[in-house]
Regions:
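Basic amphipathic alpha-helical segments that dock to polyanions
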Residues: 61-71
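Amphipathic alpha-helical dimerization/coiled-coil segments
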Residues: 98-121
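Basic, amphipathic "hinge/linker" alpha-helix immediately C-terminal to the N-terminal HTH DNA-binding motif
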Residues: 28, 80-103
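N-terminal helix-turn-helix DNA-binding core of bacterial DNA-binding proteins
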Residues: 18-60, 81, 89
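N-terminal leader segment of winged-helix/HTH proteins
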Residues: 1-27
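Short loop/turn motifs at secondary-structure junctions and domain boundaries
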Residues: 14, 79-80
Length: 121
């Protein structure tokens, strides 16, 4: 399989040395933690993540996958040659965000009526 080419900048610019601000610089946009959530719940491919109920636009999903890979939160491996398609998995650094996602779920269930976790039907 051909290697995945990363055409993005080598580093993400951080606003300050504050750990909270720096973390938000990496994953604080509207979509990144939802991609992490989907990977935590077993989704692996672009198409699987794209079908999530929030309706992430295709260009945004491609950008977030590339950015999360660039900062070491996810990694990709080609599973098909023509056309080349990738499966995504969380790195140990990415799996460490599981507690953050869980904290958001707990907060939402407590403070936003009608919300639930993905595992609840």
């Amino acid at each position: 399989m051909p290697p995945r080419r990363n055409t993005r900048k080598a580093a993400t610019k951080l606003r300050s040395s504050c750990a909270a601000a720096s973390t938000l610089d990496l994953v604080g946009d509207k979509w990144s933690l939802l991609v992490v959530r989907d990977l935590l719940h077993g989704k692996r491919t672009y198409g699987e993540i794209l079908r999530s109920p929030e309706g992430i636009p295709t260009n945004i999903l491609a950008d977030r996958l590339a950015r999360l890979e660039q900062v070491g939160i996810i990694e990709s491996a080609a599973y098909q040659e023509r056309p080349v398609r990738y499966a995504y998995t969380l790195t140990p650094k990415g799996r460490d965000l599981g507690d953050v996602v869980l904290a958001l779920v707990r907060w939402g269930k407590k403070h936003i009526p009608g919300t639930r976790s993905l595992t609840e039907k």
